[in-house]
Amino acid sequence: LLEESPHIFIKVLRQYGALKPLFPELDQLFGVKYRLQNHQDFDRGYGALIALEKTAKLSQSGPVRFAVLVHSLEESIIADRELSSKSKRLDLRVSMLKSLCDRLKIPRKYRELSINFARHYKTFFLAQQLEPRKLLKLISAVSDKSSTCKFENFLLCCEGISRDGQRDDNEALISGRYVRSAINIANSVVIASPKRDGLQGREIGQEIQKLQLAKLTEFKKNFSGR
C-alpha cells in the first residue's frame, strides 16, 4: 500500500488468483455493480481500485489508503441479505472490516482509521443535514481536540472515495469545510471557572455540551459555505 501505485498490486493479486484467498471480502466486490452519476453501471471492485489509485496521489499514508480500499466491504453481499435499516447495513460493514483486520492482524493505526471511517463516512457526506446533536456526535467521532491529524486523515479518506464516480468531486470539500468549521466552534467552548459557576464532575461536561449545542445551532443558521 505504500508504493507509488498500490492499486496495481491489488490488480496483480487478482490476475493471478491470489486476491481471493488473501482478501476474499475485497475479491467479492468485483462483479458487483453500482450506478455512476452519469447513470452508467460500474463494477465496485474496480471502483475501489480507482479510489485507491486517486487516494495514493493525495496521500502517502498507509492507514488512509487502506481505509479507502476497504470502506464498503458489505456491498459484496448486500444483495443476499435482508437489511431493513441503515443501522443493520452499518453493523455488517463494520463487522466484516473488523473480521478482516483480526484475521490479517492489521496494525492498530490502520485498524482504527479504517473502522472509524467505515462507521462515519456516510454521515459525513450528510453533515449539513444533521441537527446539532447529531453533528456534535459526528465531530466528536472524527476529530480530536488535542490534534488535527485525526480529522485530516478522515478528510483525506473522504476525498479519496469522492473520486470513484459515485459522488461529485467537490462533495468532500464542501462537507469538509462545514465539518471543520463546526469542529472549531465546538472546540472554542470553555468554562473558565467551573467552581465559580457551581459546577463539578459530570456537570462540567454537561454544561460544555449544552454550550456547544447552542453554538452549533447558531452556526447552522448562519453558515454560508465560504
Model-derived features: positions:
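Long, charged alpha-helical interface segments
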Residues: L1-A56
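C-terminal subdomains that position terminal phosphate/3'-OH groups for nucleotidyl transfer/ligation
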Residues: Q28, G45-R226
